[in-house]
Regions:
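Solvent-exposed, acidic/polar segments of extracytosolic/periplasmic ligand-binding ectodomains
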Residues: 270-326
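Structural motif
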Residues: 60-62, 115-129
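Extracytoplasmic ligand/sensor domains, especially the bilobed periplasmic-binding protein
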Residues: 2-114, 161-191, 197
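Hydrophobic alpha-helical
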Residues: 10-23, 99, 121, 136-156, ...
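Extracellular/periplasmic periplasmic-binding protein-like sensory domains
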Residues: 46, 153-237
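Catalytic-loop motifs flanking and including active-site residues across diverse enzymes
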Residues: 59, 63, 95, 142-145, ...
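Short acidic/histidine-rich motifs immediately flanking catalytic phosphotransfer sites
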Residues: 1-3, 131-136
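Short, charged, surface-exposed loops that flank catalytic or proteolytic processing sites
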Residues: 224-227, 248-264
Length: 326
């Protein structure tokens, strides 16, 4: 086996990372954001792991940058004192790690509150942030705890904007918050996104994906539309595309196809993600993608007849977001 391309399942990935490193088998793309994938300056066989989709640890850095960045052109939320509510599970701990990591380079006051992911009321944490005058809240958590947080903010009449992970970027989930009054014009929820088809380039990439998937389905007894909007199909496609980009770069270099040369090429190449931004694995950094867009949920039904995600700011690299902060 030369490489694992598209490694799926949080538990599966977590259980096999050490084995892949031990054997030196490259892994390109993991369909999970667990913090075990996060590495800074990896060396030796640790370098063979190449995560692509956002890792909580890295995304936390983006959340803080977007929370503090100026509101010009929708780049950020313009926060001056940031409240962080983090669940004590893997998602919360990973995201808050990233927040604290990025805070090392930003002159901003932050108030942290830990909560139990299974709790049904976060009023104590919410009141701490409200009483401290936090004007933006970062929600380091998954969808279910986010619902609890938003309801607690509603009940406390705490009207500030909230920013959270792409894992909660669901029009159904966020639309329900509008319905129950947790989200209002004075208390918006913003979420990141690592894929964006709202741009001409993004839609062109999607149509290329659609064409490839449709052709494969028709050749294999499908309808040609079975996986057009399937997130797992997109994940597998992106994994394969990154791998092919690496093989093409290796071929153009004239180097022999082996693990050592493949790993060198992976570190030397800046990859373009279909429907997304760019990603680099240089210098042993395994941060996954940190070029993310910013969305919010509509406050009224859109043309679809449902609440819709609205693009606030297109995909920007973390470096570009940070450059807007004075």
């Amino acid at each position: 086996m030369f490489a694992i391309v598209g490694h799926f399942g949080t538990n599966t990935v977590a259980a096999t990372l050490d084995y892949l490193k031990e054997k030196g088998i490259p892994m390109v793309y993991a369909a999970t954001g667990i913090e075990d994938l996060y590495q800074e300056g990896a060396t030796g066989n640790d370098k063979v792991i190449y995560p692509v989709q956002p890792i909580y640890n890295s995304e936390g850095r983006v959340l803080l940058a977007r929370a503090v960045a100026p509101t010009d052109n929708g780049v950020g939320l313009g926060g001056t004192k940031i409240g962080v509510v983090a669940t004590t599970d893997d998602a919360g701990s990973g995201l808050v790690y990233g927040v604290k990591k990025q805070a090392e380079t930003l002159d901003v006051e932050i108030v942290y509150q830990d909560v139990d992911a299974a709790a049904t009321d976060y009023s104590a944490a919410v009141n701490v942030l409200k009483n401290n005058g936090c004007d933006v809240v970062i929600a380091c958590m998954n969808q279910a705890p986010l619902a609890t947080l938003m309801a607690s903010m509603r009940d406390a009449d705490y009207n500030v904007d909230v920013i959270t992970s792409y894992v909660s970027a669901s029009a159904v989930t966020l639309g329900a918050f509008v319905e129950n009054g947790s989200v209002t014009a004075d208390r918006r929820v913003y979420s990141t996104a690592w894929l964006d088809t709202s741009t001409e380039e993004g839609m062109a990439d999607y149509m290329t994906f659609y064409g490839a998937m449709s052709a494969w389905e028709l050749e294999n007894g499908g309808t040609g539309n079975d996986y057009a909007l399937n997130s797992y199909a997109m994940a597998g496609y992106i994994a394969g595309d990154i791998f092919i980009q690496a093989l093409k770069a290796l071929d153009e270099s004239g180097l022999e196809l082996n693990w050592a040369n493949f790993n060198d090429i992976m570190e030397a190449t800046e990859f373009k993600l279909p429907m997304g931004g760019t990603i680099s694995f240089a210098n042993g950094d395994r941060l996954a993608v940190t070029s993310l867009a910013l969305n919010t949920i509509s406050l009224e039904y859109g043309e679809s007849g449902y609440y819709e995600l609205e693009l606030v700011s297109p995909i920007m690299s973390l470096e570009d977001v940070l450059a807007t902060i004075k």
